[in-house]
Amino acid sequence: MADVVLGVGTGVFIITLIWILTLALTIILSRATGPTKLGIIPVVLLALIITLVLVFFPRAAEVPAPQRAAQIVDMFFIGRYVLLSLVSLVFLAALFMLLPLHFLEPIYAKPLRTH
């Protein structure tokens, strides 16, 4: 049942697409002149046959088989923590390199006004 969208399977979408294309082709062929207009009949019959095959010969069972719960396994667990430790070390190194610049910044005295 992994291919269920909006509660229906892919077959419903295929049938809908087939009939939309059939409708478009019949509209196009109805505007034609002469014997080309008769092309509507095979288009509709082909869509009808495909629809009947999809309805009466489904590939999956009507009741889906019970599925067991999927077990989620983190395969990149060690790599993620190695990456986290490297980023933490770089952050701490940058922090300790910036702290002396912050604390040792000279503060100059303002000159007193003498009258």
Curated annotation (Swiss-Prot):
Location of this chain's protein in the cell: Membrane; Cell projection, Cilium
Membrane topology of the entry: Multi-pass membrane protein
TM annotation in the entry: 8-28, 38-58, 81-101
Any one Gene Ontology cellular component term annotated for this protein: cilium
Domain of life per record: Eukaryota
The keyword Coiled coil appears for this protein: no
Effect of gene knockout: Morpholino knockdown leads to the formation of pronephric cysts and hydrocephalus, features consistent with a ciliopathy.
Classification via InterPro entries: Tmem218
Stated role: May be involved in ciliary biogenesis or function.
Full protein name: Transmembrane protein 218
Organism annotation: Danio rerio
Source taxonomy: Eukaryota, Metazoa, Chordata, Craniata, Vertebrata
Name of the gene: tmem218
